[in-house]
From Swiss-Prot:
Comp. bias (Polar residues): 97-108
Gene name tied to this protein: N4BP2
Domain-related comment: The Smr domain has nicking endonuclease activity, but no significant double strand cleavage or exonuclease activity.
Organism for this UniProt entry: Homo sapiens
SUPFAM superfamilies cross-referenced by the UniProt entry: P-loop containing nucleoside triphosphate hydrolases (SSF52540), SMR domain-like (SSF160443), UBA-like (SSF46934)
Disulphides: none
Smr domain boundaries: 1691-1770
Descriptive protein name: NEDD4-binding protein 2
Top-level class of the enzyme under EC nomenclature: hydrolase
Ranges where the record places region Disordered: 1-40, 95-129, 712-756, 795-822, 836-862, 890-913, 1580-1606
Function: Has 5'-polynucleotide kinase and nicking endonuclease activity. May play a role in DNA repair or recombination.
Residues in CUE domain copies: 46-89
Length: 1770
C-alpha cells in the first residue's frame, strides 16, 4: 500500500528525555495484541500482515511491543521500524549491561525477577505470567517474585546504583525490609545512600508489598526483554542522566512510576505503602479507576501505615511521565502510608516535581523544576481501592507530597489491558530536531488535556535547559498528588501567572506555559507579560494525531478528564490565536468560563475523595495554620475532622470515634485543633455523615463545591459569610450545602447538627481552600483572579465579597488578638460577627448586607439606641454582639435581620423574641440556630467573654464598621440580592456616617449592659437542640424555641428542663437533618410561593404575572430574579415607599437623613429594637420575634423585607429606623408618640411593603386594599389584586402583619399616639372606617411612593398606616391634595409655562395641588389605564408615562388617600428640605418609573440569548467584519446552503480566506462561472470549446485563487482583470477566426478560392492570436493562483490547458524535489487538478494527463480527495 505520510505528530516522534531511552509501552500479552490497543490499531488484514512480518523481523522483541509500536505509529512502517530498531538495539544493550541493573520495583509481577540485562529462557513464560498477572488479581506468587527481584537487587553492587537525583533529595530507607514484603523481608536490598531508582508506581501490589529491586542504575529497569515487552520502558543506562529510571517499567503494574533515587526512607514508605497495598487486593480495572482523580489513600490503617511517614520527595520519587506504562487491570489499592504516598487511582504515573532544593545536578529535564508550595514529596503509586477502602481512609496522617508538575496522561485500554499508548513519549526516535530558542521567548502551549502538552513542554525544556515550565496544574499537586479543586482554579491561575511574572522579571527564557490555553483570553495575562518584558511569543500545539480526538484525549490525559468534558472544551477551542487577538480578548461569561474551566473539575467528580484527600493534605498545611483564619480553621476543622478525624474504618462515628478524631485532631496542629475541637463535634456529625457515607461524601464535595458556589453566591452576596468561621461556616456551609441542595432555607431549618455539618462543610471548604495558604491569603487571591475559563467564576464574586468579610474577620480576629482571645474566642468572636454573617448567610444576598449592616448596625444600633436613649436597651442588645459575638439580644435581632432576608428567601428562621427575655431566648435560639448552642450556654460563654468581648465589641465594632464601610460600598453588589431584606436596606448603603456614628456611639456602649457572648458551641449544645427537636428533652419554660415555618413563625415553646437525660442518646455525630425544622416540601413550596410573594411585595410595580414569568424564567431563583430587577434599576416597592415614607417621617420627625445610613441604622436599630426589651421591639412586626404575631409578621416581613426593617423600629430605634425605613420608623421623635406614629407608619409601611398586608388586617380591608393597593405600594409598584390577595392571605396567615403590628404597637408601644393613633389602631382593626384624611393622605403619600413627600407627621403616619381606610373615607372627601413629583412639576412648568414659582426654589409644598374628586377620578382612571397598558406591554407616550407614574405614586391610593397623601406630602415636604426630598424622589421616580418589568425581561432575554449565542460560538461575537465576510462568502458560494456555509465559516474561526480555500479545495472549483466562457464553450467547436474550457477553468481557478489567496480576497469581484482581458482577446480572436473560416468556406463554395484562401489565412492568424492570448491568460492564472500555494507545496492547475498544466507540473516537481533534497520540508506536493467540472462535457482532462505523467515518471502519488493528488517527492 502506498506509504502514508509520517505522522509527525505521532508519539513515535516524541522523544523521551533521554534520546536513547526507549519507552516501550507495556502491552497486554502477545495473546491479545489487538485488544491491547483497540483504539490505536486498525485491525485490518494488511495491518495484521504487517504486524506478523515485523514481528518476524524483530523476533527478539515481544510481539506486544511490536504491535504497540505499530499502533503508536499508526501502522506506518517507516516510523515503526525506527522505533523497533532502537528498541532492539536497546534490548541488546540491556542484555549487555548486566553489570548495571536498575532498581526496579515490580509490584505485581515477578518480572523483576529477571533483570532486563539478563535474557532468560523463561521470558516467554514470564510474559505469560505477566499477562496473567495483568489479567487477574495478583496472587501470593507476587511476593516470591518480589523477593527474587530483591535478591537480585541485593546481589547488585551498591556502587552501581545510580540516582538521578542528588542524594540529598533522597530519603534513605531505614529499613528496606520493611518496604519489602514480609516474605522478602529476609532480603536486604542494597539501598545505598545513593538514590535508588524505584519504580514507585509499581507499588500497586495487590497482596504483596512493593519490592524495591535496586538494580544497577544503568541496567534496564525491568527484567529482560520480556519485561520490556510487558513494560514499555527500556532505559538505556548509558545515559543515566537521561535514562529515567524513574520511568522504570512495572511489568505487572500497569503504571510504572520510576522512583528515581528513593531513599531507604522512601523505600520504607513504599514498603509501608506496599503493605498497605496488600490490604486491598482487589484488582481494579483502570478504566474504572481512571475516571477517578488521583486519590490520596492516605492513611489506611494498615500495618504498613505505621511505617515511616516521611513523605518521599518528589525528587526521591521521580516519575517521568513517559516512562510509565501500566496495565490498568490490576491495581490493588495501595493505601498510602500515613498519606506519605499518594496513590493515583488513575494509575497514571505522574511526573514528580523536584523538591524546592536546587535541582539535582543531573536533574531530568522531564521533571519540572518548580516546587509546590509544600515541601514534602511522596511516592505516588497508582492505586485503585475497593469501595470499602475507599471511605475508610485514615486522614490522620499528613499526606505525602508528590508534586507532579505534568502528570503523564493515563494510558489505559478499555479491556484493562495496558493499551499502553505512551502518551507523551512512547518511543524516542533516534533523530529528533532540537528546538532551541534564541532570545527571550514565551512559549504558550495549547491543547486539550491529554494532547501531549506536558510532554512537549518537557521536550522543549530539555532542548532549552535554561527554560522553565509553568503549569497551573502544579498548583494542585499536593504532596505529589494531583488534587484538583475547582474552587482554587482562579487562585491557581493567578499563582501560575505570578510565577510567570517572576520568570519574566528574571529574564528566564524560554518560559513555557503548559496550560490548556483553549481560548485567547486565557493566555492574555502571559502575553501581556511577554509584551511588557519584550518576549517573543510562540504558540505551540502538541503535534500529536489525537490532539483533537476527544476519545483518545480522554484515554490519554492523566487527570481523568472525561470525554464529554474534553468534547466541551474542544468546542471552546479557539483554533486561531495571535498576540493581537489575545490582547483584544476578554474574559468570557462565567458559565462559559466554568465550562472551559480546567478539565480537572471532572477529576474531582471522578473521585469523591479528591476533595477530601486534598483537604486532608491541605489539612497538614492547614493544621500548621493558625486559627486566626478562623474561617479557614473552621472549614479546615471540618475538613480535618472529616478527613483526618474519620478513621478509615469508621463507618459511622461513635463516641469513641469522635474522641478518636479529636485525638487525631489534637495530633494535628494545636491551633487547628482548637478550631477542630470546637468544630469537631459538628465535624464529627457532618464528617461522620458526609464522610462515612459515599453519598454524604459526594454531597460534601457537592457541598464543598456548592458551598464554594454558595460561597461564591453567598460570598458574592455576603462577604460576611465566610468571615464567620464557625457560625458562618456552620450556617453557610449548611446554607451552601443547602443552596446546593434545597437552598438557603435549610440553614435556618438545619438543626445544630446541620449547622455543624455545614460548618464542617465549610471547614472542609476552607481546608480545600487552604492548601497551603491561609484563607485570607487565598481569598484575596480568589478575588484577584477572576479567571474563568480554567477557573470558576462564581467564586470570584463570592470571594470578593468574602474579602470584605475577611476584612471583617481579620478585624475581629485582630481585635481578638488584641484582647488575647483564645482562638476559640476568636472563633466565637468571628462567629458572632459572623453570626450576622451567618444570619446573613441565611440569605446570602442579604447576609452580606446584614453582615455589614449587622456589624455596622451593631455599632450603629448602639449608636442609634444611644442617640435615642433606647440605647440602653438597644445598647444592651446591640452590644451583646460585643466580642464579634453579639450578645443574646443583639444576636437575636441581628440574627433576625439576617434571617429576615432568609425569610425573605422564604427560609423560615427562628425569630427570637424582641424582649430581653425573648432576646435571651432569641439569643439562645439564634445561637442555636447559628451555633446550635443553647441560649443558656451561649449566655454563659458570652458572659465569660463579656468584658473582653465588650472591648472587642468596641474595637470590633469599629473594625466591623470599617469593614462595613468597605462592605457598604461592596454592599451595593449584594444589595440587589438582599432585596429580601427591607428594600430600604437595599437602596441604602451603609454610609460612612453610620460607621462614624457607630464609632461615636461605640464609646457610649456600656459593656456592663451587654449580655455575655458565647465563644464556642459545645457538642452538648447541639445535642440539646437535637433533643429538643426530637422532643427527647422535657421542655422547660426557660427556653423558648421558635421554629421557622413557612406559614409564619409560630413560637414552639419548649419547656426545656435539661434533665440528666439530656445526655441520653446524644448523637455525637449530630447529623444534619434536613427536616429538622422545615420539611423539604415546605421549603420547596416556600421557595416558590414565598419567593413569589416576596417578589410581588418588593417589586409591586410589576404585575404578578410578569413577576411570576420572570421568576420562572430565572429557574425560580429568587436571587436571580431580584438581581435582574434590581440591576434593571427597578426599585423595591418597599424601598420607594419607605424612602418616601421615610422622607416624610424623617422630614417631620427626624429630618433629613441619608437613606443608606439610615437604612443601616434602622437595620441596626431594628436589631436593637428587637434586642431592646421595650415593647416596641414587639412592635417590630417585621422582626416577628416578639410574638406569634410578630412571627407571622416575620413571615410577612419575609414577604416584605421592609417589614423586617419596620419591625426593627422601636420607639427608641424608631428614629434611626425611620431614617432607615421611613415606613419602618417613620421618624418618631417622641419614642412614644412617634413610635405609635412610626409604628403606624411602620405598619403602614409594612402594609405598603405588604400592600396585601395593609389590607390583610381585615379581609374587607384586604379586598379593598387589593383594589387600592394594587397601586398602593409604590406608584409604579402595582400589585395585581391576586397578588395582594396572596399577600393578604400571607399576612393573614402571619396573623395579619398589620394587625400584629397594630397589636404590637398597641401592646408594646401601648401606642401612645395622638388621638389619631388610637384611631389608627382602631383603624388597624377597621382601617377603612377609622382612617383620618391625614392618615389617608399619609397612606396615599406612602403608597404613592413617588409622590411621597419626605416628611410625615404622626398624623400623616397614622394616615399612612391606613391606606385602605383612606378609600373608605374618600367617600366623604371633597378634594384631595396631589403632591406632584418634582419631575412632573418641572415638566409642567416647561410645557405650560411657569406657575409663579421659580423652578429653582420649588419646594415640596409648592408641588401640592388641590384636586377635586372628579379630577382625582380622572387621574385614577388614567392611572388605571396606564397600568393596564403597561401590563399589556404597550408603552405609553413618554409624557403620559411620566405623568402616570407620578399619578400612580399619588393617585395610587384612592382619591381621599391622594388628598391625605398630599397633606402628608406637604408636611413631609415641609419637614424635609426640598433638596433632600427631591433628589430621592427624583432618583426613585426616574429609576422606578422608567423601567418596566417587560423591558427588563426583554433585555434579560435578549442578553441571555446573546450570552447563549456567545457560548455557542465560543465567545465569538460576530462583528460587522465577520458579518460582511459571511455575506461575501454567501456571494462566493451562492449554490451552497447558507447554514452549511455558516458552519464551515465558524469552524474556520470566521476566517474567510481559510473558509474559501477549504471550500474550493472541497468543491474543486469556484461556484462562480463566467457566463461568456460557458457560452463560448457551448457555441464553439472542439477548439473553441477547448479554448473556452481553458478560459473557463482559468476563470474558476482565478476565483478559487482569489478565495484562497487572502491578500486578494478584497478583489474577488474583479480579481483578474488581466485575465479577463486576455480571455476577452482570445474570445475575440476565436470569433474572428470562426468568421474567417466561415467566409473562407463560403467563398470556396462559390468558387472564389483566392478569397477563401485569404479568409483561411486570416482565420489562422486569429487562431494564433487566440492561442497567444490564452497562453498569456494561463500564465497569469498560474502565477496568481500559485503564488501563495507553491510555498505550501500546493500546485493548482485549474484553468490551464493540458499541455500547459503538464509543463508547469514538470517544472514545479523538479523544483520542489530539489528543494526537498537540499532543505528538507514537506516530502510531497499537492497537485490540484480539478475534477473536470469546468471542462467541456464535464470530463476532466488535466487530471488524467497528470496521472499519466506521474505514473510514467515513477512518482508515488495518491488522490487524497477528488481532484487533488498528493505526489511524493523523490
Amino acid at each position: 500500500m502506498p506509504r502514508r505520510r509520517k505522522n509527525l505528530g505521532g508519539n513515535p516522534f516524541r522523544k523521551t528525555a533521554n534520546p536513547k531511552e526507549v519507552v516501550v509501552s507495556s502491552v497486554a500479552s502477545r495473546e491479545e495484541p489487538t485488544t491491547t490497543l483497540p483504539s490505536m490499531g486498525e485491525t485490518k488484514v494488511d495491518q495484521e500482515e504487517l504486524f506478523t512480518s515485523i514481528s518476524e523481523i524483530f523476533s527478539d522483541l515481544d510481539p506486544d511491543v511490536v504491535y504497540l509500536m505499530l499502533s503508536e505509529c499508526d501502522f506506518k512502517v517507516e516510523n515503526a521500524m525506527d522505533c523497533l530498531l532502537e528498541l532492539s538495539a536497546t534490548d541488546t544493550k540491556i542484555e549487555e549491561s548486566s553489570s548495571q541493573s536498575f532498581v526496579a520495583s515490580e509490584n505485581q509481577v515477578g518480572a523483576a525477577e529477571s533483570k532486563i540485562m539478563e535474557k532468560r529462557p523463561e521470558e516467554e513464560s514470564e510474559d505469560s505470567k505477566m499477562d496473567s498477572f495483568l489479567d487477574m488479581q495478583l496472587t501470593e506468587d507476587l511476593d516470591s517474585l518480589i523477593q527474587n527481584a530483591f535478591e537480585k537487587l541485593n546481589s547488585s553492587p551498591d556502587d552501581q546504583v545510580y540516582s538521578f537525583l542528588p542524594s540529598q533529595d533522597v530519603n534513605s530507607f531505614n529499613d528496606s525490609s520493611e518496604f519489602i514484603n514480609p516474605d522478602s523481608s529476609n532480603m536486604t536490598p542494597i539501598f545505598s545512600t545513593q538514590n535508588m531508582n524505584l519504580n514507585g508506581e509499581n507499588l500497586e501490589n495487590s497482596g504483596s508489598t512493593l519490592s524495591l529491586n535496586p538494580l544497577p542504575s544503568h541496567s534496564v529497569l525491568n527484567e529482560s526483554k520480556c519485561f520490556i515487552k510487558d513494560n514499555t520502558l527500556a532505559l538505556e543506562s548509558n545515559y543515566p542522566e537521561d535514562s529515567l529510571l524513574s520511568s522504570s517499567l512495572n511489568v505487572a503494574s500497569d503504571s510504572i512510576a520510576g522512583c528515581s533515587s528513593l531513599n531507604q526512607k522512601q523505600k520504607e514508605l513504599l514498603e509501608s505503602e506496599c503493605v498497605e497495598a496488600q490490604f486491598s487486593e482487589a484488582p481494579v480495572d483502570l478504566d474504572a479507576s481512571e475516571p477517578q482523580a488521583c486519590l490520596n489513600l492516605p492513611g489506611l490503617d494498615l500495618p504498613g501505615t505505621g511505617g515511616d511517614q516521611k513523605s518521599t520527595r518528589v525528587s526521591d520519587v521521580f516519575l517521568p511521565s513517559e516512562g510509565f506504562n501500566f496495565k490498568p487491570h490490576k491495581h490493588p489499592e495501595l493505601p498510602t502510608k500515613g498519606k506519605d504516598v499518594s496513590y493515583c487511582p488513575v494509575l497514571a504515573p505522574l511526573p514528580l516535581l523536584l523538591p524546592p532544593p536546587p535541582p539535582p545536578p543531573m536533574w531530568n529535564p522531564m521533571i519540572p523544576a518548580f516546587d509546590l508550595f509544600q515541601g514534602n514529596h511522596g511516592f505516588v503509586a497508582p492505586v485503585v481501592t475497593t469501595a470499602a477502602h475507599w471511605r475508610s481512609v485514615n486522614y490522620t496522617f499528613p499526606p505525602s507530597v508528590i508534586s507532579h508538575t505534568s502528570p503523564t496522561k493515563v494510558w489505559r485500554n478499555k479491556d484493562g489491558t495496558s493499551a499502553y499508548q505512551v502518551q507523551e513519549t512512547p518511543v524516542s526516535q533516534v533523530v529528533r530536531k532540537k528546538t532551541s530558542y534564541v532570545g527571550l521567548v514565551l512559549v504558550l502551549l495549547r491543547g486539550l488535556p491529554g494532547s501531549g502538552k506536558s510532554f512537549l513542554a518537557r521536550t522543549l525544556q530539555e532542548d532549552n535547559p535554561s527554560g522553565v515550565i509553568l503549569s497551573t496544574d502544579d498548583y494542585f499537586y499536593i504532596n505529589g498528588q494531583y488534587q484538583f479543586d475547582v474552587k482554587y482554579l482562579g487562585e491557581a491561575h493567578e499563582w501560575n501567572q505570578n510565577r510567570a511574572k517572576e520568570a519574566f522579571e528574571k529574564k528566564i527564557s524560554p518560559i513555557i506555559i503548559d496550560n490548556t490555553n483553549l481560548q485567547a483570553w486565557e493566555m492574555k495575562p502571559y502575553v501581556a507579560l511577554s509584551q511588557k518584558h519584550k518576549y517573543k511569543v510562540l504558540f505551540r500545539e502538541p503535534d500529536t494525531w489525537w490532539k483533537f480526538k476527544p476519545k483518545e484525549l480522554a484515554r490519554r490525559n492523566i487527570h481523568g478528564v472525561s470525554k464529554e468534558k474534553i468534547t466541551r472544551m474542544l468546542e471552546h477551542y479557539q483554533r486561531f490565536v495571535s498576540v493581537p487577538i489575545i490582547m483584544s480578548s476578554s474574559v468570557p461569561e462565567k458559565i462559559e468560563r466554568i465550562e472551559l474551566c480546567a478539565y480537572s473539575c471532572e477529576d474531582r467528580s471522578t473521585s469523591p475523595r479528591d476533595d477530601e484527600d486534598i483537604i486532608s493534605e491541605k489539612e497538614e498545611n492547614i493544621l500548621s495554620l493558625s486559627l486566626k483564619h478562623l474561617e479557614f480553621t473552621e472549614e479546615k476543622n471540618l475538613d480535618v475532622t472529616k478527613e483526618t478525624m474519620l478513621p478509615e474504618n469508621v463507618a459511622y462515628l461513635s463516641n469513641a470515634d469522635l474522641n478518636k478524631r479529636r485525638k487525631e485532631i489534637s495530633d494535628m496542629n494545636p491551633s487547628i485543633q482548637s478550631a477542630l475541637i470546637l468544630e469537631t463535634p459538628h465535624m464529627y456529625f457532618s464528617d461522620s455523615e458526609s464522610k462515612l457515607q459515599a453519598t454524604d461524601k459526594s454531597e460534601n464535595e457537592q457541598i464543598e463545591m456548592v458551598a464554594v458556589k454558595g460561597y461564591s453566591k453567598t460570598d458574592t452576596d455576603s462577604s460576611m459569610e465566610r468571615v464567620s468561621p464557625s457560625t458562618c461556616c456552620s450556617e453557610n456551609n449548611q446554607e451552601d450545602c443547602d443552596l446546593a441542595n434545597s437552598g438557603p432555607l435549610q440553614n435556618e431549618k438545619s438543626s445544630p447538627g446541620e449547622i455543624v455539618e455545614e460548618r464542617a462543610t465549610v471547614t472542609k471548604k476552607a481546608f480545600g481552600k487552604q492548601k497551603s495558604k491561609s484563607t485570607l491569603e487565598k481569598f484575596p487571591r480568589h478575588e484577584l483572579s477572576n479567571f474563568v475559563g480554567d477557573w470558576p467564576v462564581d467564586k470570584t464574586i463570592g470571594q470578593r465579597t468574602k474579602r470584605n468579610r475577611k476584612t471583617e474577620k481579620t478585624s475581629s480576629v485582630q481585635s481578638d488578638k488584641k484582647y488575647n482571645y483564645p482562638q476559640s474566642h476568636k472563633l466565637v468572636n468571628s462567629v458572632s460577627v459572623n453570626t450576622d454573617c451567618v444570619q446573613q448567610r441565611g440569605s446570602p444576598h442579604e447576609s452580606v448586607e446584614d453582615g455589614r449592616k449587622s456589624q455596622c448596625d451593631d455599632a450603629s444600633e448602639p449608636l442609634n439606641s444611644y442617640k435615642y436613649d433606647a440605647y440602653k436597651n438597644i445598647d444592651k442588645n446591640s452590644f451583646n454582639i460585643m466580642g464579634d459575638w453579639p450578645s443574646s439580644d443583639s444576636l437575636a435581632q441581628r440574627e433576625h435581620r439576617s434571617r429576615m432576608p432568609k425569610t425573605g428567601l422564604s427560609e423560615p428562621n427562628l425569630e427570637i423574641g424582641t424582649n430581653d427575655k425573648m432576646n435571651e431566648i432569641s439569643l439562645s435560639t439564634a445561637h442555636e440556630a447559628c451555633w446550635g448552642t443553647s441560649s443558656q450556654k451561649l449566655k454563659t460563654l458570652g458572659s465569660s467573654n463579656l468584658g473582653s468581648s465588650e472591648m472587642l465589641l468596641s474595637e470590633m465594632t469599629c473594625e466591623s464598621q470599617t469593614c462595613l464601610s468597605k462592605k457598604s460600598h461592596g454592599q451595593h453588589t449584594s444589595l440587589p440580592l438582599t432585596f429580601t431584606n427591607s428594600a430600604p436596606t437595599v437602596s441604602g448603603v451603609v454610609e460612612p456616617q453610620t460607621l462614624a456614628e457607630c464609632q461615636e456611639q461605640m464609646p457610649k456602649r456600656d459593656p456592663g449592659k451587654e449580655v455575655g457572648m458565647c465563644t464556642q458551641t459545645e457538642p452538648q449544645d447541639f445535642a440539646l437542640l437535637w433533643k429538643i427537636e426530637k422532643n427527647k428533652i422535657s421542655i422547660s419554660d426557660s427556653i423558648k424555641v421558635l421554629t421557622g415555618r413557612l406559614d409564619g413563625f409560630k413560637p414552639k415553646v419548649f419547656n426545656i428542663n435539661t434533665k440528666s437525660d439530656v445526655q441520653e442518646a446524644i448523637p455525637y455525630r449530630v447529623m444534619y437533618d434536613k427536616s429538622t425544622f422545615v420539611e423539604e416540601s415546605e421549603l420547596t413550596s416556600a421557595d416558590e410561593s414565598e419567593n413569589l410573594n416576596i417578589l410581588c411585595k418588593l417589586f409591586g410595580s410589576f404585575s404578578l404575572e410578569a413577576l411570576k414569568d420572570l421568576y420562572e424564567r430565572c429557574n425560580k431563583d429568587i436571587i436571580w430574579a431580584t438581581s435582574l430587577l434590581l440591576d434593571s434599576e427597578t426599585k423595591l416597592c418597599e424601598d420607594t415607599e419607605f424612602e418616601n415614607f421615610q422622607k416624610s417621617c424623617d422630614g417631620s420627625q427626624i429630618g433629613p437623613f441619608s437613606l443608606g445610613l439610615n437604612l443601616k441604622e434602622i437595620i441596626s436599630q431594628r436589631g436593637t429594637l428587637e434586642n431592646s426589651n421595650s415593647p416596641v421591639p414587639e412592635f417590630s412586626h417585621g422582626i416577628g420575634i416578639s410574638n406569634a404575631d410578630s412571627q407571622s409578621t416575620c413571615d410577612a416581613e419575609r414577604g416584605n423585607s421592609e417589614q423586617a426593617e419596620m419591625r426593627a423600629v422601636t420607639p427608641e430605634n424608631h428614629e434611626s429606623m425611620t431614617s432607615i425605613f421611613p415606613s419602618a420608623a417613620v421618624g418618631l421623635k417622641n419614642n412614644n408618640d412617634i413610635l405609635p406614629n412610626s409604628q403606624e407608619e411602620l405598619l403602614y409601611s409594612s402594609k405598603q411593603s405588604f400592600p396585601g398586608i395593609l389590607k390583610a388586617t381585615t379581609p374587607k380591608d384586604m379586598s379593598e386594599t387589593e383594589k387600592n393597593l394594587v397601586v398602593t405600594e409604590t406608584g409604579d409598584n402595582i400589585h395585581s389584586p391576586s397578588h395582594f390577595s396572596d399577600i393578604f392571605n400571607f399576612v393573614s396567615s402571619t396573623s395579619n402583619l398589620e394587625l400584629n403590628e397594630e397589636i404590637y404597637f398597641t401592646d408594646s408601644l401601648e401606642i401612645k399616639r395622638n388621638e389619631n393613633f388610637p384611631k389608627d389602631y382602631v383603624k388597624f382593626s377597621d382601617e377603612e372606617e377609622f382612617m383620618n384624611e391625614d392618615e389617608k393622605e399619609m397612606k396615599e403619600i406612602l403608597m404613592a411612593g413617588s409622590s411621597l413627600s419626605a416628611g410625615v407627621s404622626g398624623e400623616d403616619k397614622t394616615e399612612i398606616l391606613n391606606p385602605t381606610p383612606a378609600m373608605a373615607k374618600s367617600l366623604t372627601i371633597d378634594c384631595l391634595e396631589l403632591a406632584l413629583p418634582p419631575e412632573l412639576a418641572f415638566q409642567l412648568n416647561e410645557l405650560f409655562g411657569p406657575v409663579g414659582i421659580d423652578s429653582g426654589s420649588l419646594t415640596v409644598e409648592d408641588c401640592v395641588v388641590h384636586i377635586d374628586l372628579n379630577l382625582a377620578k380622572v387621574i385614577h382612571e388614567k392611572w388605571k389605564e396606564s397600568v393596564m397598558e403597561r401590563q399589556r406591554q404597550e408603552e405609553v407616550s413618554c409624557g403620559k408615562f411620566m405623568q402616570d407614574p407620578s399619578l400612580v405614586g399619588h393617585t395610587g391610593l384612592d382619591n381621599p388617600e391622594q388628598k391625605s397623601s398630599q397633606r402628608t406630602g406637604k408636611k413631609l415636604l415641609k419637614t424635609l428640605t426640598a433638596s433632600e426630598m427631591l433628589p430621592l424622589l427624583d432618583h426613585w421616580n426616574t429609576q422606578t418609573k422608567k423601567v418596566s418589568l417587560r423591558e427588563i425581561m426583554s433585555e434579560e432575554i435578549a442578553l441571555q440569548e446573546k450570552h447563549n449565542l456567545k457560548r455557542e460560538t465560543l465567545m465569538f461575537e460576530k462583528d460587522c467584519a465577520t458579518k460582511l465576510k459571511e455575506k461575501q462568502l454567501f456571494k462566493i458560494f451562492p449554490a451552497i446552503n447558507q447554514n452549511f456555509l455558516v458552519d464551515i465559516f465558524k469552524d474556520h474561526n470566521y476566517s474567510l480566506e481559510h473558509t474559501v480555500q477549504f471550500l474550493n479545495c472541497v468543491l474543486e472549483g469556484d461556484p462562480v462561472k463566467t457566463v461568456v466562457a460557458q457560452e463560448f464553450v457551448h457555441q464553439n467547436e472542439n477548439v473553441t470549446s477547448h479554448t473556452g474550457q481553458k478560459s473557463k477553468e482559468k476563470k474558476p481557478k482565478k476565483l478559487k485563487e482569489t478565495e484562497e489567496t487572502p491578500s486578494e480576497l478584497s478583489f474577488q469581484d474583479f480579481e483578474y482583470p488581466d485575465y479577463d482581458d486576455y480571455r476577452a482577446e482570445a474570445f475575440l480572436h476565436q470569433q474572428k477566426r470562426m468568421e474567417c473560416y466561415s467566409k473562407a468556406k463560403e467563398a470556396y463554395r462559390i468558387g472564389k478560392k483566392n478569397v477563401a484562401t485569404f479568409y483561411a489565412q486570416q482565420g489562422t492568424l486569429h487562431e494564433q492570436k487566440m492561442k497567444e492570448a490564452n497562453h498569456l491568460a494561463a500564465i497569469e492564472i498560474f502565477e496568481k493562483v500559485n503564488a501563495s500555494l507553491l510555498p505550501q507545496n500546493v500546485l493548482d492547475l485549474h484553468g490551464l490547458h493540458v499541455d500547459e498544466a503538464l509543463e508547469h507540473l514538470m517544472r514545479v516537481l523538479e523544483k520542489k524535489t530539489e528543494e526537498f533534497k537540499q532543505n528538507g520540508g514537506k516530502p510531497y506536493l499537492s497537485v490540484i487538478t480539478g475534477r473536470g467540472n469546468h471542462s467541456q462535457g464535464g470530463v476532466a482532462r488535466i487530471k488524467p494527463a497528470v496521472i499519466k505523467y506521474l505514473i510514467s515518471h515513477s512518482f508515488r502519488f495518491s488522490e487524497i480527495k477528488p481532484g487533488c493528488l498528493k505526489v511524493m517527492l523523490k
